[in-house]
Regions:
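Well-ordered alpha/beta subsegment
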Residues: 88-92, 98-105
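Non-catalytic, conserved peripheral segments adjacent to functional cores
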Residues: 1-91, 108-109, 115, 121-131, ...
Length: 143
């Protein structure tokens, strides 16, 4: 079972421009596949720092590097993983529930915008990879 890895996907947002500059548009339940409950952004991270390192039971995310670049490693707990490079302000990545995420290789000017489907709840975060793998295996054995 691919535990939501098949739902991970890159998103392209509309860019509207004129001589004054550009606007990127992303609306809930259109380009963003959920209603946004929380917005935060990551900046000032060094290239060798890894952020994230967790999976979520309930929260979906869209990540957009609105400035600079970073990479996102996504794992399913069954040995499958993919790496995505976020380096354009009009593209993002959709991360469903129950995928392990690691953000890293931040450029000095990186600003990573994070859109979340749920308000913050520390109890729905899985911060130990071994525990995540066990949960994935348990879920598979129940299906």
């Amino acid at each position: 079972m691919a535990h939501n890895m098949n739902e991970v996907r890159m998103l392209d947002f509309s860019v509207i421009g004129d001589p004054r500059g550009y606007i990127v548009v992303a609306e809930c339940m259109k380009e963003i596949p959920f209603c946004i409950q929380r917005i935060f952004y990551i900046f000032g991270s060094k290239r060798d720092i890894v952020r994230g390192n967790h999976a979520n039971k309930k929260t979906q995310f869209v990540l957009i590097n609105v400035a600079g670049k970073s990479k996102v490693r996504v794992k399913d707990g069954e040995g499958n993983e993919a790496i995505y490079c976020l380096n354009r302000p009009h593209t993002g990545i959709y991360l469903p529930t129950m995928v392990w995420k690691e953000m890293y290789d931040f450029s000095e000017d990186s600003v990573l915008l994070c859109l979340a489907s749920e308000h913050y709840d520390p109890n729905e975060y899985i911060r130990d990879y071994d525990q995540f793998v066990k949960m994935v295996c348990t879920e598979e054995s129940l299906s």
